[in-house]
């Protein structure tokens, strides 16, 4: 076996073992999330439907061709984040979300301006991952009951939680490097 082939084999084995760990972490995190998700199956299905309807209506509308709008639905509460070139398009996106059947509330956090660069979106993904990992490790916090959305360094926390869990979730998110602000969009268990 040549040295080059041996080196490739070693690299392949190392990368494969690292990816196996990532897959296990993702699968474990997803399983833990489902166990602690307080929404019923019908609500989860309704959230998926809401996402698809709103997302499709925005993406297929030519007026939004220069916009970047992300849609999140949790417990029939919709969060819109992203950027659009005009205030009128921001209003239109919110109207589309409000008109989707089954929506209880819409939080419109879309800003007027150019879409944020890929580098910032990559940082936002990293921040979301760090917040999620920290929540998994935090005792007293059922991370599956919290949806995390990060946009331009702002972390949005959605979910059905107790007052204590909300406080813990915000504390965890604030401690992550790169977080500029934390916005609570919680529904509280009383």
Please provide the spans of the model-predicted regions:
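N-terminal targeting leaders
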Residues: 2-6, 13-16, 21-190
């Amino acid at each position: 076996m040549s040295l080059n082939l041996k080196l490739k084999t070693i690299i392949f084995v190392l990368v494969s073992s690292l990816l196996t760990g990532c897959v296990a972490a993702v699968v474990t995190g997803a399983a833990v999330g489902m166990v602690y998700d307080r929404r019923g199956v019908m609500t989860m299905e309704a959230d998926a439907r809401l996402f698809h309807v709103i997302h499709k209506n925005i993406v297929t509308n030519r007026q939004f061709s220069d916009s970047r709008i992300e849609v999140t639905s949790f417990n029939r509460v919709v969060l819109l984040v992203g950027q659009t070139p005009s205030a009128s398009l921001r209003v239109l996106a919110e109207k589309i979300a409000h008109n989707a059947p089954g929506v209880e509330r819409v939080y419109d956090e879309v800003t007027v301006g150019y879409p944020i660069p890929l580098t910032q979106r990559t940082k936002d993904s990293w921040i979301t991952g760090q917040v999620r990992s920290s929540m998994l490790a935090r005792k007293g916090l059922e991370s599956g009951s919290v949806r995390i959305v990060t946009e331009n360094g702002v972390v949005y926390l959605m979910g059905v939680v107790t007052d204590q869990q909300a406080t813990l979730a915000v504390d965890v998110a604030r401690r992550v490097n790169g977080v500029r602000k934390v916005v609570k969009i919680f529904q509280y268990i009383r």
